[in-house]
UniProtKB/Swiss-Prot annotation:
Organism: Candida glabrata (strain ATCC 2001 / BCRC 20586 / JCM 3761 / NBRC 0622 / NRRL Y-65 / CBS 138)
GO CC list: eisosome; plasma membrane
Biased composition range(s): Basic and acidic residues: 7-16
Protein name: Arginine permease CAN1
Any Pfam family matching the protein: AA_permease
Residue intervals passing through the bilayer: 100-120, 124-144, 179-199, 206-226, 235-255, 331-351, 384-404, 428-448, 459-479, 501-521, 534-554
Keyword Nucleus: no
Disruption phenotype: Resistance to canavanine.
Amino acid sequence: MKFRNILKNEKNEKNEASASTSHASEDIEIIPSRYDNEKFYSATEATHKKKTGSTGFDDTISLTHTLSRSRIPTSMEDEDAEEAEVHDTRVKRALKQRHIGMIALGGTIGTGLFVGISTPLSNSGPVGALIAYIFMGTIIYFVTQSLGEMATFIPVTSSITVFSKRFLSPAFGVANGYMYWFNWAITYAVEVSVIGQVIQYWTFKVPLAAWIGIFWVLITLMNFFPVKIYGEFEFWVASIKVIAIVGYLIYALIIVCGGSHQGPIGFRYWRNPGAMGAGIISSDLGEARFLGWVSSLINAAFTYQGTELVGITAGEAANPRKSVPRAINKVVFRIVLFYIMSLFFVGLLVPYNDPRLSASSAVIASSPFVISIQNAGTKVLPDIFNAVVLVTVISAANSNVYVGSRVLYALAQSGNAPKQFAYVTRHGVPYLGVICTALLGLLAFLVVNHNANTAFNWLINISTLAGLCAWLFISLAHIRFMQALKFRGISRDDLPFKAKFMPWGAYYASFFVTVIIFIQGFQAFAPKFDVSEFFTAYISLILLVVLFAGCQLYYRCRFLWKLEDIDIDSDRREIDAIVWEDDEPQNLWEKFWAAVA
């Protein structure tokens, strides 16, 4: 039963809440939560354990705990309660398994893959870049495993921010929420800035600013459609990406084996100019190569961002207990096929010292995918692949706005953003979140008045660090989640999805993400300190610290929740009670996409 229906009438809900509380008080001590600004109530199990010796997960304690955590309007909330009757604040669970998989894929396969890998290839060489991407791939694998375990157990919208607040502290949750929104809003600016440059591959007759403005409007409007239409659009567009990358891998294999005028290429470019790049900054070759490799880690992190989007879509998934684990389990497949294999073949077909990799005028001209096709002398295909890149970037930008709007929605739902951001259209779209996220995307116009590559790299650095902070909070939240389960006597074997290689995987990801966060701005210190470079590299970290400190002072809460205060019941029981429709693939076509998505 959904508790919002039980508490429909204000007078009845007060009486029922009072009756439920008095009845439950025989077994449970109800204590107002000190730190929750939503006026929720938390129920402790101490008295119940003392009397019954149970673990706190029998039917009585579960029902009472869930009810006690449901929002109960008080006299101070009459105005908000009346307004809630006018403004709908519930998103729709309309995303199927194939939608969720492709949304995550759409947010990941974009500028970072098709354009961004040119920098690590130039700085680190094919082998150095490959090692960097494999290493970052292991980190994102453990991050998504951690998120998957929590998101299937408690499938809520923008779970990445919700879990930080619930399992770490309110300050962590709010700071992470705003930083994660900032990350995707900035990424939207990155993607939109590239769209115009992709089109300029064909013509310069239309100003770059015009293309940026046109596609900014179109993509923003696209996000006002119902989530089901959005999911369907993203599914088919992301399908084009999958077909294009698989097609490129087959094409690249043919070229490597001698299918062009160049003859068999094999590992020719790994021998000359070499498998490892010349590095950056330092005159010492070893040091320069190491610094170049560290720089490649940052590009790899940007490329992988979006893999965790399954956690954002959990709150709008039609069957989260099945669809989210399936999407999570395909992460390894995606990392190997779409990133590692693509980078491997690009490294075989393009030498790291090709001057086009570091082109400063047109970003798309530096795409190693396009360069490799041009080197092979295949006519028309560069134009076709450029069209694929255009569709890819539009899809990625579309996902950016979707994620950003849902993060603001989750913050408003928890009382940490203006309540207006929780208002949705009759189709369940948080329209103010879409508008606010899109407005920050106007930073894309920076590339018009500045060197394209400089502005592009500036936006990437800001976005990447904000995304790395989100990965860190996911891993830390999962560590606390596992500790809370153990404290409550719950075996992880009984969860809908059990993350692999835990808890060591979460510790591994937390440690290396922290290291990368602090060393990623090394170029600000070498060869001499550069103030501008420093703020570009660390502005996201500075914002995070300010947000966290402000939230800590505002909430006056503990640095971390006590294990006994961690809430692992809210939003879970309602999902447990729902009987979902069968979403199993029915024909060969559906089975194919189920395997891919």
